[in-house]
């Protein structure tokens, strides 16, 4: 779909199916966020267009994820010296909102609720509720979803939300000093019911 000597890592499709967000590793600016337009259809064939830069800074930005309505992109960046999760309007320009506290990576939007799930530096899942009004994005304070720690593989996300927002699959790290000999995938049902049980005061 693209021709580049720079490494490119796809992350998410826009809901309209015609835009692909990806990370490109450049020698001068590091990891940048890019968008690839794609025209055509199944009958006539798909035709990739020219990639455009969504965000390029002297810092590293990674994992651009389109919101379910296509109006926002969540990603993580080390502009503060620590990787944090941010949200920007798409296609921009506009503001920038940091939704994580004390570090974060691998944001995933819930398709069923105004929630973003991400991984914190302690390899735990965090959940952020948000409201979006026009060009304004207001995140709530992050809250811990579970005391379980994810089994982390560098460069890979170890969890994902089901489209119904009720189930989550994740790889859990072994307890204590046990050595991992075989990875296990855990499938969580009624994800947000469990979240409300652990934090009764959390919004519905």
Locations of the language-model features?
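Generic "edge-of-domain/loop-turn" microfeature
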Residues: 18, 27, 40-43, 71, ...
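Conserved beta-propeller blade repeats
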Residues: 5-23, 53-76, 97-117, 151-167
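Blade-level signature of beta-propeller repeat domains, shared across WD40, Kelch, NHL, RCC1
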Residues: 158, 162-203
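Hydrophobic alpha-helical membrane-insertion signals
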Residues: 109-114, 119-142, 161-179
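A structure-centric signal for secondary-structure junctions around beta-strands
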Residues: 17, 30-32, 48-51, 82, ...
């Amino acid at each position: 779909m693209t021709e580049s000597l720079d490494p490119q890592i796809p992350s998410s499709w826009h809901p309209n199916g015609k835009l692909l967000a990806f990370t490109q590793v450049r020698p001068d600016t590091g990891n940048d966020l890019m968008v690839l337009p794609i025209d055509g259809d199944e009958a006539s064939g798909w035709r990739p267009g020219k990639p455009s830069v969504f965000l390029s800074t002297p810092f590293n930005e990674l994992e651009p994820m389109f919101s379910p309505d296509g109006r926002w992109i969540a990603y993580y960046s080390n502009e503060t010296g620590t990787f944090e999760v941010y949200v920007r309007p798409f296609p921009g320009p506009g503001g920038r909102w940091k939704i994580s506290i004390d570090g974060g990576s691998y944001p995933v939007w819930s398709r069923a609720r105004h929630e973003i799930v991400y991984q914190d530096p302690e390899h735990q899942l965090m959940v952020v509720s948000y409201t979006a009004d026009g060009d304004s994005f207001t995140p709530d304070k992050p809250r811990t979803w579970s005391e379980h720690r994810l089994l982390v593989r560098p460069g890979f996300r170890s969890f994902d939300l089901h489209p119904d927002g009720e189930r989550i699959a994740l790889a859990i790290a072994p307890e204590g000093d046990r050595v991992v000999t075989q990875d296990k995938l855990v499938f969580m049902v009624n994800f947000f019911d469990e979240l409300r049980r652990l934090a009764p005061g959390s919004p519905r």
